[in-house]
């Protein structure tokens, strides 16, 4: 079990002349270190006294999932007009036994989905940006992250809270100068001007901006 070597264990002999072989053993305990030892016997019957040895940790426990945020800053991204690019950062993934080996991401129209991008390995990076996407305006997309440990176990997928895509610009439906509700062609005040407008958007308006010129 890695802590001691029991000399009463039975030695297993492969077929004569094999340099490597496979033995399937199913009664292993998760988290324990196991040691495999080997010895050679020559044609004269002499047995190797200095044993070959190698150890491994039996690990079938998946890593612990963390959290994912859309965008590359500490402020989570909620909206995007870019239909080819998505990005995300993540923290909090861990593995107590063999340790983390890599991360993978996918992008979908639902948490855990792969509709926009299949699972892609990003080594040990804790951020991603994919500029090869074909997204649709008016949908919500989620970035999903899973961790892979040194033994090949995958964590459950952690998902962002989603980015809403919208590349349809708002429409100004009316604009008024000289009054907030009706358009005026002349005014006497030379120090200020009242401007009014109305606008619509297929999703949600964020803010207005106005300029004045000749």
Which residues does each predicted region cover?
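Recognizes extended acidic, P/S/T-rich segments that occur
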Residues: 1-29, 104-136, 207-214
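Hydrophobic/tyrosine-rich beta-strand signature of extracellular beta-sandwich/beta-rich modules
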Residues: 36-38, 145
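Flexible, low-complexity linkers/stalks enriched in Thr/Pro that connect modular domains
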Residues: 42, 52-73, 82, 108, ...
């Amino acid at each position: 079990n890695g802590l001691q070597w029991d000399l009463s264990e039975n030695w297993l002999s492969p077929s004569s002349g094999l340099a490597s072989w496979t033995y399937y053993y199913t009664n292993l305990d998760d988290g324990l270190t196991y040691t495999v030892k080997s010895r050679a016997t020559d044609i004269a019957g002499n047995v190797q006294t200095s044993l070959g040895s190698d150890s491994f940790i039996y690990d079938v426990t998946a890593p612990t999932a963390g959290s994912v945020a859309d965008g590359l800053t500490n402020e989570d991204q909620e909206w995007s007009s870019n239909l080819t690019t998505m990005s995300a950062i993540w923290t909090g993934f861990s593995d107590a036994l063999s340790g983390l080996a890599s991360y993978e991401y996918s992008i979908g129209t639902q948490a855990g989905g792969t509709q926009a991008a299949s699972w892609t390995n990003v080594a040990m990076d804790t951020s991603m940006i994919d500029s090869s996407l074909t997204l649709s305006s008016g949908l919500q997309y989620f970035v999903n992250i899973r961790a892979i440990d040194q033994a090949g176990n995958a964590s459950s997928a952690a998902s962002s809270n989603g980015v809403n895509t919208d590349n349809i610009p708002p429409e100004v439906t009316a604009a008024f100068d000289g009054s907030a509700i009706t358009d005026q062609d002349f005014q006497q005040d030379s120090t200020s001007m009242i401007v009014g407008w109305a606008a619509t958007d297929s999703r949600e308006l964020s803010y207005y901006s106005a300029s004045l010129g000749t």
